[in-house]
């Protein structure tokens, strides 16, 4: 008898998450030198991690025979101070994606519903369906921002979680403070609102969502060390929420979920504000470069407040494959319902120039 015959049907129906294509895999498949490949597919930090984080990893490496602090006391204390909240209002995970999973563990079941934007982080539907919940997509507005009135209309008595990605991924648009305030004034109490702010550092004027935590609302604010802080390979993210919400999430969390190297690196990275400043400045320069290049090429793009940009190329998957064959990895968007578009992460000036050179070749 096949094991699939008695497995959970909603798990069998899932499509596994597809990350940006790794450099090593591309090199193997195409016979390329890994050092000649430019990866602009996963919104990573092109400047790398903070040197202080690297030093912290080296100092901590000799202690990996000892279990880490399961409560991540020092890191959570630093996060609480940085965000202006209490220690008990913090939870850390192996990337903010683990905190998303904890939320789903705590709240979802086959009778529950989740509301999110049509073009949103693909882990939302994966995690929702993993727990058997119905996933309700709300189309974006004409300016590509979240339609929060549409979210309100989609909420039912069975809705348990609403995901608001701000800035959005893969689009890069931002919902403003007034729209969020209006939404929060109307959202029912039986709904947990999750503000996913993975790209917040790149936004010019990010709204204040932590005020809802301080007010004791049913919210979780998600942030990460994977993007602006350059620690994607260590998987460190966190959530800020009222203490009852955090207490619930900690009950679902696996013990020792954040290893010692990740904790020490994140602590050091959080203190290195100058590295984040340089990262944001590099991103702004890269964004200006791409916008000018697209303007000259006559391509449509969506102004982005993230560290990536969405551009319309007509045959997204084919352009992705053609660029891949030339050693430049971008991200096709057919999986997000945007088959004519590709997403390009902002790289170093040299990487950005190479990307545009190759894009011109394949179009």
Curated annotation (Swiss-Prot):
Entries under Pfam families matching the protein: Aminotran_1_2
Superkingdom field: Bacteria
Key word Amino-acid biosynthesis present: yes
Pathway: Amino-acid biosynthesis; L-histidine biosynthesis; L-histidine from 5-phospho-alpha-D-ribose 1-diphosphate: step 7/9
Co-factor(s): pyridoxal 5'-phosphate
UniProt keyword annotations, A-Z: Amino-acid biosynthesis, Aminotransferase, Histidine biosynthesis, Pyridoxal phosphate, Transferase
Listed PANTHER family: HISTIDINOL-PHOSPHATE AMINOTRANSFERASE, HISTIDINOL-PHOSPHATE AMINOTRANSFERASE 2
Name of the protein this chain belongs to: Histidinol-phosphate aminotransferase
Originating gene: hisC
């Amino acid at each position: 008898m096949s094991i699939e015959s008695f497995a959970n049907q909603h798990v069998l129906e899932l499509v596994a998450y597809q990350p940006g294509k790794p450099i090593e895999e591309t090199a193997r498949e195409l016979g390329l030198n890994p050092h000649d490949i430019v990866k602009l597919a996963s919104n990573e930090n092109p400047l790398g991690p903070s040197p202080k984080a690297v030093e912290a990893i080296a100092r901590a490496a000799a202690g990996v025979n000892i279990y880490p602090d399961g409560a991540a006391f020092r890191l959570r204390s630093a996060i609480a101070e940085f965000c202006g909240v209490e220690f008990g209002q913090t939870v850390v995970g192996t990337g903010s994606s683990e905190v998303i999973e904890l939320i789903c563990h705590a709240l979802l079941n086959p009778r529950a519903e989740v509301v999110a934007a049509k073009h949103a982080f693909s882990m939302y539907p994966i995690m929702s369906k993993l727990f058997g919940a119905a996933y309700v997509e709300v189309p974006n507005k004409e300016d590509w921002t979240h339609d929060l009135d549409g979210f309100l209309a989609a909420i039912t008595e069975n809705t348990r979680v609403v995901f608001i990605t701000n800035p959005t991924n893969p689009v890069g648009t931002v919902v403003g403070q007034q729209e969020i305030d209006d939404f929060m004034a109307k959202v029912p109490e039986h709904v947990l609102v999750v503000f996913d702010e993975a790209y917040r550092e790149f936004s010019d004027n990010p709204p204040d969502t932590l005020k809802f935590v301080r007010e004791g609302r049913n919210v979780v604010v998600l942030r990460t060390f994977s993007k602006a802080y350059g620690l994607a390979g260590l998987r460190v993210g966190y959530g800020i929420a009222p203490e009852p919400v955090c207490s619930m999430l900690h009950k679902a969390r696996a013990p020792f979920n954040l290893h010692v190297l990740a904790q020490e690196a994140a602590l050091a990275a959080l203190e290195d504000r100058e590295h984040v400043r340089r990262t944001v400045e590099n991103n702004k320069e890269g964004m200006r470069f791409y916008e000018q290049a697209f303007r000259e090429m006559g391509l449509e793009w969506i102004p982005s407040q993230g560290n990536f940009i969405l551009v319309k190329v007509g045959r997204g998957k084919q352009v992705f494959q053609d660029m891949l064959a030339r050693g430049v990895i971008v991200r096709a968007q057919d999986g997000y319902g945007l088959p004519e578009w590709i997403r390009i992460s902002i790289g170093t000036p040299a990487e950005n120039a190479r990307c545009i050179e190759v894009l011109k070749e394949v179009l």
